C-alpha cells in the first residue's frame, strides 16, 4: 500500500449518492455571506454546494435586522424550495422550518457527519478517495439500511452480514469498525446554569462563600458541581456528565441549596438567570473566555470583581455550530 493520501488528495465528496438535494428535503447549511437578495450558504451534506435563502424566506414575521435572524458563520436548518440541476441553483427557506424539523435535521446531520468523518479517516489511511469508499461501502449501506450509521453500528456486532458481497479488503473493514466504535463512544455533556448571589448584610462576603460552598457539596461520584465567578454577584454552575437529566437535576439541587443558605442571612438573596443549558462550540468558548481570569470559588478565595463581564450568549440561539471534520 502506498503512502496515505493527504487531506487535499482525498477528493472530498458529498455525504449521499444523489448529487443534489431534493425539493422539501431538510438540510444543514453554513451561512457564508448576506447580500440584498438573501443569504448565500454552503450545503454541508453536499460538498459545500452553494445555495441561497431569499430574504422573503428568512422569517414569517416582519424584521428590521437581518442579523437577528441569521448570521455569517452560523449553521442553520433549511428547507429546499427549488433545485435547478443544470444551472446549479438551489433556493432554500428558513421560515418554513418548524422546531420539530430542526431537531429531526440536526439528529440526521449528526449521524451522517459521524459516517463522513469515518470515511475520510479510513480513505486517507488506505490510499483511497472519499468517493471511492462511499461507492463501495457507504452509499450501498444507506440504500439498504436507511442510514449508514445504523448499518455500521450493526456491523460492530455482525460484520460478516453487513459487509457481505462488498468489494473491500479485510483491512478496510477493520478500519471502518474501529473508527466508528470510537465515534459511538458516549461523550460527556457540559451543562451550565447562571445565578446571582449576594448579601448586603454584615456577613456579606462570608455569607456568599458559605452558600456557594454548600452548593458544591452536593457533588457525588456521578456528577461534580463546579461554581465559577464571572463578576459579583454573577456566578455560573458548571458540570459534565453523560446523563443530561441527571446533570440538570444536580444543578437545580445546587441552586436550591445555595438559595436556601444565602436567605438565612439578613440581606442575602438569590436569583437564577435563564435556563440550564447544554453548552458546546461557541457557547463553551465564550464561557471559557469569561472564566479565563477566574478560578473556581472556594471559601478561601478573594471576593473580587474585574467589572461587569457577561457572556452575551443568547439562550434562544438554538443552532449548534459543530466543528467541521476532525
From Swiss-Prot:
Main location class: cytoplasm
Family indicated by similarity: Belongs to the eIF-2-alpha family.
Function noted in UniProt: Functions in the early steps of protein synthesis by forming a ternary complex with GTP and initiator tRNA. May regulate protein translation in response to amino acid starvation. May regulate protein at various stages of parasite development.
Keywords of the record: Cytoplasm, Initiation factor, Phosphoprotein, Protein biosynthesis, RNA-binding, Translation regulation
GO cellular component: cytoplasmic stress granule; eukaryotic 48S preinitiation complex; eukaryotic translation initiation factor 2 complex
Annotated region described as Disordered, given as residue ranges: 291-326
Phenotypic consequence of residue 59 to T: Mosquito infection by gametocytes is normal leading to the generation of sporozoites that are able to infect mouse host
Effect of residue 59 to D: Phosphomimetic mutant. Lethal at the blood stage
GO biological process, one term: regulation of translation
Segments forming domain S1 motif: 24-95
A Gene Ontology molecular function term of the record: ribosome binding
InterPro entries reported for this sequence: NA-bd_OB-fold, S1_domain, S1_IF2_alpha, TIF2_asu_C, TIF2_asu_middle_sf, TIF_2_asu
PTM statement from Swiss-Prot or TrEMBL: Phosphorylates at Ser-59 in mature trophozoites, schizonts and gametocytes but not in rings and young trophozoites. Phosphorylates at Ser-59 by eIK2 in salivary gland sporozoites but not in midgut and hemocoel sporozoites. Dephosphorylated at Ser-59 by UIS2. Phosphorylation of eIF2alpha subunit of the pre-initiation complex eIF2 inhibits recycling of inactive eIF2-GDP to active eIF2-GTP by limiting the activity of the guanine nucleotide exchange factor eIF2B and thus, inhibits protein translation.
Acidic residues composition bias: residue spans: 298-326
Protein name: Eukaryotic translation initiation factor 2 subunit 1
Source domain of life: Eukaryota
PTM-bearing positions, type Phosphoserine: 59
Compartments, as annotated in UniProt: Cytoplasm, Stress granule
